[in-house]
């Protein structure tokens, strides 16, 4: 079993309680990038229920924050998902061997395997230019 242990424990990445806009999937990605790569991603002020309003916050991730789409993921790549939606509405961090770190709505942040559940919602992997 692959075990991910964050480098810094001042802001634990695993076991967080969910809170929209403060402790959610994107804040987990931001904190991972800050702790693991010393890269500070900009915050996004998500509008509540944005994915059902047709807003596409993750669509411009590449141009806005320095990410490029990649085919073969490596540790630290952002993985994006469309979960019961027409726009990408969930993100996580690829760790290793199909294991990713994420924070789903109303759950605690955790590591999970992309298979069999999450792979059907995955849209793409994105790599930061400085990671």
Protein language model regions, located:
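Short, flexible active-site loops
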Residues: 8-18
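Active-site nucleophilic cysteine motif
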Residues: 18-37
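Short amphipathic alpha-helical patches
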Residues: 32, 52, 56-60, 124-128
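Residue-level marker of positions within ordered structural domains that often coincide
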Residues: 33-34, 97, 130
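Glycine-rich phosphate/pyrophosphate-binding loops
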Residues: 37-46
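...with weaker cross-activation on analogous glycine-rich loops/strands in unrelated enzymes
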Residues: 45-109, 115
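Glycine- and charge-enriched low-complexity intrinsically disordered segments
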Residues: 112-131
